UniProtKB/Swiss-Prot annotation:
It is an enzyme of class 2 (transferase). It catalyses: RNA(n) + a ribonucleoside 5'-triphosphate = RNA(n+1) + diphosphate. It comes from the Bacteria. Residues 255-339 are annotated as: Alpha C-terminal domain (alpha-CTD). Keywords: DNA-directed RNA polymerase, Nucleotidyltransferase, Transcription, Transferase. The gene is rpoA. GO terms for molecular function: DNA binding; DNA-directed RNA polymerase activity; protein dimerization activity. This is DNA-directed RNA polymerase subunit alpha. The N-terminal domain is essential for RNAP assembly and basal transcription, whereas the C-terminal domain is involved in interaction with transcriptional regulators and with upstream promoter elements. InterPro entries: DNA-dir_RNA_pol_insert, DNA-dir_RNA_pol_RpoA/D/Rpb3, DNA-dir_RpoA, RBP11-like, RNAP_asu_C, RNApol_insert_sf.
Length: 339
């Protein structure tokens, strides 16, 4: 059994209320995520760890070699084709793939001119998905003919061309350096967060750009899982034997006194105030239990009002989507208005 005194090493640390996703800017290639409050210093610790893992350790798919009929090496040209082989290889490196298997897949292009060949013209089986079918690969003139075979697979990080050489490949097979990572860029910023009257906590803002083969929110989840799995070996006790955390009744918990204030004190715009009144939201405690989705369903309540309320709540160390058990409590803090 883990000593209850020892568990205070991690149980006494403040934990984020949850991960907030910026729904306005969220897309299949970009996401902004905010976690607060964090203990001082944890913003940089977590932000830097997640950034490094996102950029280096997530799996993706890429073309790793190509064999073109009539071509022996990458410095040759193909009759009646506008691009030389070097340019074609550069274009192949930018083809975005999803491969739903761990097997090496064979892709083909078989075309006669005149025509433009795009990524969508690649012949593949049902386990391979081309994510940018409009991407240009080459242009064939009248009388031209192209037959090429490529290999593609899943991998991690950047792999140079010489590492993609496979013994026994046919003569004329050209290995390609592959960038498997689905992550294009990661930024993070650490600012101050407020908890009650204290402002010496961290707020972590994380921005993630992907190639579209993985959703930004999934990418962050995968990176966090990798970090968690790697750190688990350092825990030298059985977490199952850890004593259950004592849950105090709501009356005994120290509630943020702002929860008992009327929403009229928030000095909101007329539109936002009217929306809260129509939704029968009287106190800040009532308000913070609403999710963003629930608020947006309120009549005449839009994104501008949502942003206004989120900013005001953040200044109080509060946010939408909080869970307050048995609200309102039987006894309000001394000096707080009755609800």
């Amino acid at each position: 059994m883990v000593d209850p005194i020892v568990t205070k090493n991690w149980r006494d640390l403040i934990k984020p209320r949850g991960l907030v996703v910026d729904q306005e800017s969220l897309s299949n290639t970009y996401g902004k995520f905010v976690a607060e409050p964090l203990e001082r210093g944890f913003g940089i610790t977590l932000g830097n760890s997640l950034r490094r893992v996102l950029l280096s350790s997530l799996q993706g798919a890429a073309i790793t070699s190509v064999k073109i009929e009539g071509v022996e090496h990458e410095f040759m040209t193909i009759p009646e084709v506008a691009e030389d082989v070097t340019d074609i290889i550069l274009n192949l490196k930018e083809v975005l793939l999803q491969i739903h298997t761990n097997e090496v897949k064979t892709l083909r292009i078989e075309a006669d001119g005149p025509r433009e060949i795009k990524a969508g013209d690649i012949i593949a089986d049902g386990q391979v998905e081309i994510l940018n079918p409009g991407h240009h690969i080459l242009t064939i003139s009248e009388g031209g003919r192209v037959r090429m075979e490529m290999t593609a697979r899943r991998g991690r990080g950047y792999v140079p061309a010489d590492k993609n050489k496979v013994p026994g490949q046919p003569i004329g097979t050209i290995p390609i350096d592959a960038l498997f990572s689905p992550i294009r860029k990661v930024n993070y910023q650490v600012t101050n967060a407020r908890v009650g009257q204290q402002t010496d906590y961290d707020k972590l803002s994380l921005e993630v750009w992907t190639d579209g083969s993985v959703a930004p929110n999934d990418a962050v989840a995968y990176a966090a899982k990798i970090v968690k799995e790697q750190l688990s070996i350092f825990i030298n006790f059985d977490e199952a034997e850890e004593p259950a955390e004592e849950v105090k009744p709501v009356e005994e918990q120290k509630l943020n006194e702002n929860l008992f204030r009327s929403v009229d004190e928030l000095e909101l715009s007329v539109r936002s105030a009217n929306c809260l009144q129509n939704a029968n939201i009287k106190t800040i405690g009532d308000l913070v239990q609403k999710t963003e989705a629930e608020m947006l369903k309120t009549k005449n309540f839009g994104r501008k009002s949502l942003k206004e309320i989120k900013e005001i709540l953040a200044e109080m160390g509060l946010s939408l989507g909080m869970k307050l058990e048995n609200w309102p409590p039987k006894a309000a803090p001394q000096g707080a208005p009755k609800v």
